[in-house]
Curated annotation (Swiss-Prot):
It is an enzyme of class 2 (transferase). GO terms for molecular function: transferase activity. The active site is at C500 (cysteine persulfide intermediate). Its cofactor is pyridoxal 5'-phosphate. This is Cysteine desulfurase SufS. The keyword Plastid applies. It is found in: Plastid, Apicoplast. Catalyzes sulfur activation and mobilization in sulfur mobilization (SUF) pathway for iron-sulfur (Fe-S) cluster biogenesis. Active when in complex with a partner protein SufE. Required for apicoplast maintenance. Plays a role in the development of sporozoites in oocysts in mosquitoes. Keywords: Apicoplast, Plastid, Pyridoxal phosphate, Signal, Transferase. The lineage of its organism: Eukaryota, Sar, Alveolata, Apicomplexa, Aconoidasida. Pathway: Cofactor biosynthesis; iron-sulfur cluster biosynthesis. Belongs to the class-V pyridoxal-phosphate-dependent aminotransferase family. Csd subfamily. GO terms for cellular component: apicoplast.
């Protein structure tokens, strides 16, 4: 009987003493160590992705706001697409750094002081952030229910809770505060809007709901179940290009008078592609102005700023936009849904859940209800989570968006560059997974079937596509689970599996699973370089095991 993969792993660890090369984090410095005495500092060379050192320092200072990275032997965390780490101002853990001048970039002190705006829009406060440490503060001194009591503490809690609605409204620049509905996250929001539309909008069997293979299960399964149970509506899938972007011309041809809903992710949680949202919405609305466009912004909200009024002026505003707080530095269990007021007024939507906080009067046989948004927020909400979500948005708002995008994509380009340097012809960069005709496609980075090590990545940036710093990688020589297990031994966190996007893997990439690296602005170049080294080293080792007959 062949030994299991786990047995081989244990054996290799003992023989090779593999753990002698791991990621270390000290309190005052970040370094990559082959042993405590030897450190590999990041160095820039010709041909490498480059960014000004001052920009790197900006984000290293912002990283200081995150208590997670202050712990001893802190992991190198590359799973921010699953959930982000939380800053101290959100969760209520004190940080030792208190002076604002620590965030002033050296670039701001050069002869060209306006070359870069500071990523933090500094206030007159002597502290880095005017926002208190909300989660702890609320539960320790402000804990009261909202929309119920008339005593001061309850009124204060209600005021803080409703202020977040205004914060989100201003952040996405929508028309009205009552267009913002608090949810427990994107899954809740998608189930809520799915239920409402299936009740009021989808009336016939031929009514169409358009999705893509790129969607998270939360944007597929609710539609499938509602269509099956209510026996009305039908699901259609929007064609994709081989690069993973929506084929807008073919989408336009498919939109007709039966099209009722188009529900898409702005950013894929596996590929990281940023869809051309304005062009997609315009194409839909030009063919059917009554079609309802839903945008899953779970992966995009932390990286992209939305201006819904501007989009509305250009006839490319989504009717619904949904996001999860924990994906943009807020606590778990909170999120929001933007629901256009004209839509609510036209269809008189009914809520998914019934209970308290949503009624005006209750009779023996029927009740009268509040107006939106309270109509859709039944029961006791996650008050502390919502208030902390407002603090997280204020935190993000202080970071310069253009600088953030440049830095994150610099980290992404660095990762791809170093993978290429370490693996050479063994790195296969695919511009796509499935061709438009349905056959296999892909580009090759020059790898041959006889190469000792092959690692595939889907890199749409290679063809000029816009994306956020998410990189899927896999091999036909070893399992992504083995890769991630070995990385975990090295104190590195990335994810493996289908990433709640089974259709994308099966129908587009045509693989059973993959590993995923998702970067965020608190990651550092040193971490990324170490990650690339370890992925390459482990990939070569696992490929060698496979060639030796170990499976």
């Amino acid at each position: 009987m062949r030994p299991s993969s786990a047995a081989w792993i244990c054996l290799l660890l003992r023989i090779a003493n593999y753990t002698c090369y791991s990621y270390h984090v000290g309190r005052s410095d970040l370094y990559v160590g082959r042993a405590p005495r030897r450190m590999t500092k990041l160095s820039y060379e010709n041909g490498k992705p480059h960014i000004d050192a001052g920009v790197v320092n900006y984000f290293k200072q912002i990283r200081e706001e995150f208590p997670f990275f202050k712990r001893e032997n802190c992991p190198a965390y590359f799973d921010s697409a699953a959930t982000t780490q939380k800053p101290a101002c959100v969760i209520g853990v004190s940080c030792p750094i208190a002076q604002l001048h620590r965030f002033v970039s050296p670039l701001c002190l050069t002869a060209s002081p306006h070359r870069f705006a500071s990523p933090l829009r500094l206030t007159a406060s002597p502290h880095r952030f005017a926002s208190p440490q909300k989660l702890t503060q609320f539960y320790s001194s402000e804990n009261a229910n909202v929309h119920r009591g008339i005593y001061k503490m309850s009124l204060d809690a209600t005021r803080s809770y409703e202020q977040v609605r205004k914060t989100i409204k201003n952040f996405i620049n929508c028309e009205r505060e009552d267009e913002i509905i608090f949810t427990s996250g994107t899954t809740h929001g998608l189930n809520l809007i799915c239920s409402m539309l299936m009740e009021r909008v989808i009336k016939r069997r031929q009514d169409e709901i358009h999705l893509t293979y790129l969607e998270h299960h939360s944007n597929i399964v609710p539609w499938q179940e509602q269509v099956k149970r209510k026996k009305k509506g039908k699901i259609k899938y929007i064609p994709l290009k081989s690069t993973g972007y929506i084929h807008i011309k073919r989408l336009r041809k498919r939109i007709n008078r039966n099209t009722k809903v188009v529900s898409i992710s702005h950013v894929s949680n596996v590929l990281g592609n940023i869809q051309k949202l304005t062009a997609i919405i315009k194409a839909v609305k030009e063919k059917n102005k009554n079609a309802i466009v839903i945008v899953d912004a779970a992966q995009s909200f932390a990286h992209i700023r939305y201006d819904l009024r501007r989009m509305e002026a250009n006839n490319c505003c989504p009717d619904v936009l949904i996001a999860s707080g924990h994906k943009f530095c807020a606590p778990l269990g909170c999120g929001f849904m933007y629901l256009k007021n004209t839509l609510t007024c036209s269809y008189k939507f009914k809520p998914l859940l019934y209970g308290s906080n949503m009624i005006t009067t209750v009779g023996k046989y029927e009740s009268e209800f509040e107006s939106p948004p309270q109509l859709f927020e039944s029961g006791t909400q996650n008050i502390a989570g919502v208030i902390s979500m407002g603090v997280a948005i204020n935190f993000l708002e202080r970071i310069d968006q253009r600088l953030l995008c440049r830095y994150e994509m610099f980290l992404y380009d660095m990762l791809v560059y170093h993978l290429g340097q370490h693996l050479q012809r063994g790195l296969v960069q695919l511009p796509g997974g499935v061709s438009e005709s349905g056959g296999s496609s892909g580009g090759s980075g020059g790898s041959r079937p006889t190469d000792p090590c092959r690692l595939y990545i889907h890199n749409s940036r290679r063809g000029g596509g816009k994306k956020v710093p998410i990189l899927p990688l896999w091999s036909d020589q070893f399992s992504s689970f083995d890769l991630v297990t070995f990385l975990d031994f090295k104190n590195v966190c990335i994810r493996s599996g289908h990433h709640c996007a089974s259709l994308l893997l099966k129908e587009f990439l045509r693989i059973p699973d993959c590993a995923r690296v998702s970067l965020f602005f608190y990651n550092t170049p040193e971490e990324v370089q170490f990650l690339a080294e370890q992925i390459a080293s482990i990939a070569r080792m696992l490929s060698g095991m496979n060639r030796g007959g170990v499976k």
